[in-house]
C-alpha cells in the first residue's frame, strides 16, 4: 500500500524532472498546471495522499458491505487501490466467490490504474479532466475491447454462461493489465485466444501517475504517434508531420527517451526469459515468468507459475533471477 503511493509521488514529482523514459511529458502537467492551485510538489503529494487514503477507505467500506469481514475488507482495499494484489487467501479474490466483490475489485483496480493527478484536477473543479485525457481514453477503450472479446470467446467457445463469462473476463483481465495479480480462475486454461492476450497485456500496465507498474499506456501512444508520423513521411517526403500526445506536440527528446525505454525493457525481458529457459523451464513458463516478473504482475502462465501454480516449485536459481 505504501509502495502504491510512492509510485504515484515519484511519477508526479520526481521522474518528470529526471527526464527519463518519456516522463518529461508530464512536467507541465504535474508541475506547472498543478502549481497554480498547489504551489509546491510537497503540497501536490499531500493532496494526492489524501485522495489515495480516501479511495482506500471507500473500497474498504464497499468490500465490507459486500460481505467481507472488517479485516479482509481493509486488507483487500489496500491492495486493490495500490494494484498490489496481495490477498488473505491462497485462492486470491476468488476465495469469496461473490459477483459483487469481484466487480467492486475490478472497479477499484481501474481506479488505481488511472492518473491520480487527474483526480486532483477533477476535485479542483476541472470536471472534464478525466474524460479529456487521451491516455485514459486509450486505456479504458483497450480494457473494454479486451473484455468484450474475451467474454465472447468464453461464452461461444468454452460454453460458459454469458454472465459468468463477463465476470471472469472483467476481473481477470483488469487484474493482469493493471499488474494487480488477483485471480478468480485459471485463465491459462481458457484456450488459444485468451492465452496470448494475457501474455501481452502483462506488459501494458496502467496510466502514468497511477499505482500500476508495466510500460504504461502513454509510451504506447508516443510509439504509435511516432510510427504514424514516419509512415506519413514515407508517403509524402516533403510534408510536415508532427506527432502529438494529449493534443501537445512531442519533442524528439521524448521520442528518443521512450524508444530507449522500450529497448531496455525488452532487452532485460529477453535476457531474463533466456536465463529461465537455460535453467530448464519450458518456453511458456520461462517467457511468461519473465514478463510477470519484470512487469511486477504476479501470476504467469502454465502449470508451474500460472494462477493455479506457485513459484515455489521452481529451481532456486530461477527464483534468484
Segments the model singles out, each with a brief description of its role:
Residues 1-321:
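Membrane-proximal intracellular helices of multi-pass ion channels
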Amino acid at each position: 500500500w505504501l509502495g502504491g503511493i510512492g509510485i504515484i509521488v515519484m511519477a508526479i514529482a520526481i521522474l518528470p524532472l529526471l527526464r527519463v523514459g518519456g516522463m518529461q511529458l508530464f512536467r507541465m502537467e504535474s508541475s506547472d498546471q498543478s502549481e497554480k492551485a498547489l504551489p509546491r510538489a510537497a503540497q501536490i503529494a499531500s493532496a494526492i495522499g489524501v485522495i489515495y487514503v480516501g479511495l482506500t477507505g471507500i473500497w474498504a467500506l464497499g468490500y465490507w458491505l459486500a460481505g467481507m469481514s472488517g479485516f479482509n475488507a481493509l486488507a483487500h482495499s489496500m491492495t486493490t487501490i495500490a494494484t498490489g494484489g496481495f490477498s488473505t487467501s491462497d485462492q486470491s479474490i476468488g476465495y469469496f466467490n461473490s459477483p459483487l466483490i469481484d466487480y467492486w475489485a475490478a472497479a477499484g483496480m481501474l481506479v488505481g490504474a488511472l492518473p491520480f493527478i487527474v483526480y486532483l484536477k477533477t476535485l479542483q473543479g476541472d470536471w472534464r479532466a478525466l474524460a479529456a485525457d487521451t491516455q485514459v481514453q486509450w486505456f479504458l477503450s483497450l480494457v473494454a475491447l479486451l473484455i468484450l472479446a474475451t467474454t465472447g470467446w468464453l461464452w461461444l467457445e468454452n460454453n460458459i454462461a454469458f454472465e459468468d463469462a463477463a465476470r471472469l473476463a472483467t476481473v481477470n483481465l483488469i487484474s493482469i493489465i493493471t499488474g494487480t495479480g488477483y485471480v478468480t480462475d485459471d485463465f491459462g486454461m481458457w484456450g488459444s485466444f485468451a492465452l496470448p492476450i494475457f501474455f501481452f497485456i502483462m506488459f501494458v500496465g496502467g496510466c502514468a501517475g497511477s499505482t500500476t507498474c508495466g510500460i504504461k499506456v502513454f509510451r504506447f501512444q508516443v510509439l504509435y504517434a511516432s510510427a504514424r508520423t514516419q509512415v506519413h513521411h514515407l508517403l509524402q517526403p516533403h510534408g510536415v508531420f508532427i506527432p502529438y500526445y494529449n493534443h501537445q506536440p512531442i519533442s524528439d527528446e521524448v521520442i528518443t527517451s521512450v524508444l530507449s525505454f522500450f529497448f531496455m525493457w525488452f532487452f532485460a525481458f529477453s535476457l531474463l526469459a533466456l536465463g529461465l529457459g537455460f535453467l530448464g523451464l519450458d518456453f511458456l513458463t520461462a517467457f511468461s515468468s519473465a514478463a510477470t516478473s519484470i512487469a511486477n504482475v504476479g501470476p504467469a502462465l502454465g502449470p508451474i507459475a500460472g494462477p493455479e501454480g506457485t513459484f515455489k516449485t521452481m529451481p532456486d536459481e530461477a527464483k534468484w533471477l
